[in-house]
Amino acid sequence: MSIIIGINAFHADSSAAIFKDDELLFAIEEEKLNRLKHWAGFPELSIKKCLEFTKIDSRMVTDVSMNTNPLSNLNKKIPYFLQKYLFGNKKKEIFKRIKNKIEIKNYLVENLNFNKSVNIHFIDHHLSHIASSFY
């Protein structure tokens, strides 16, 4: 049995969805819960609501899929990052964003009681759009 949480985070309209054996059970956007239009942070309330609605314990989640891969297309991103973040006024922001994505497993284990053995999958952002059309 597989239980998968899909997370759209750090991007406009953050949300979460939960699947059991490839069947969508529940999905919700964070803005429906925190009342902040087009929320672009981490959808913690959405994840909790997915688990609550389906009555699934967070320790039973086998996989988490993130809507972005912080290391994809790095060769194209580096010139942009250098110009905007390294030499601009947002120097620390880019490193914080990448760090948040990479450390997602620690956050889920420490704050939402996920099992340490949960598998984290980083999916390229555009591939995530393509995959969503399947459902």
Which residues does each predicted region cover?
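Short acidic/glycine-rich loops and adjacent helix/strand connectors
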Residues: M1-Y135
